[in-house]
UniProtKB/Swiss-Prot annotation:
Listed GO CC annotations: bacterial nucleoid
SUPFAM superfamilies: ArfGap/RecO-like zinc finger (SSF57863), Nucleic acid-binding proteins (SSF50249)
Lineage: Bacteria, Pseudomonadati, Pseudomonadota, Betaproteobacteria, Burkholderiales
Biological role stated in the UniProt entry: Involved in DNA repair and RecF pathway recombination.
Protein name: DNA repair protein RecO
Gene source species: Paracidovorax citrulli (strain AAC00-1) (Acidovorax citrulli)
GO biological process terms, semicolon-separated: DNA recombination; double-strand break repair
Family stated for the protein in its record: Belongs to the RecO family.
Amino acid sequence: MAARRISDEPAYVLHRYDWSESSLILDVFTRHHGRVALVARGAKKPTSNFRPVLLPLQPLRITYTLNGEGREEVHGLKGAEWVGGHVMPTGDALLSGLYLNELLMRLLAREDTHAALFDAYAGVVRVLASEHGDALEPVLRSFELLLLREIGLLPALDVETSTLAPLAPAARYALVPEAGLRPALPSDRSTLGGAQWRQLERSLGEAQPYTATLRAIVAGLAASASPAADLKPQLRALLQYHCGSPMLRTRQLMIDLQSL
């Protein structure tokens, strides 16, 4: 029986591992088949057509054959073509992109389809190719929110998680891993106002493509520096809680670079 072939699939390389002297194992995020593992035979050879193409944060179209039905199967890469459209991110934008890749590898199950999230990720990568510094913050926070909502790990942001009481617009609330969204305590370092949380929920809940949702959230966060800055540590704690140990490698690298 001939192996099933997936052709011209939109994809991004999340990570690559040495498999042999000449081959690589790839962790790839595809639009229609989710996160898949592929072996790229001969990709490390100087003459390989794969060599200049299989890079992170670059839009690809790939062809591969399925080696089985299990989620732990490693499939065989047969072709990869760079779609083009933007340059490779550099500096802090590159590190931010690798951080998002690590989140996807930690949080997405193998071969679970997330087409809308893929489209949002593609939009973020385009931003990373052209922006740096403070302009990245609202984009990263927005994608973190979309990712958590897509995989069912983000509570409703317009009610208190434990009581389902609607948020008071003028009150302050904190998002914490163990309790969800709750009234702020004096010990909380980062909180948002009820009106701000409710606006985020409205943006996430609108019946529109994730790319449009992403733009709406970015616009809301970019309107003021405070919401994005206050949201960052709360989302970071929630993401680390669900990613488990050890700390995200890209996050540790950011800490190490800041200490230099």
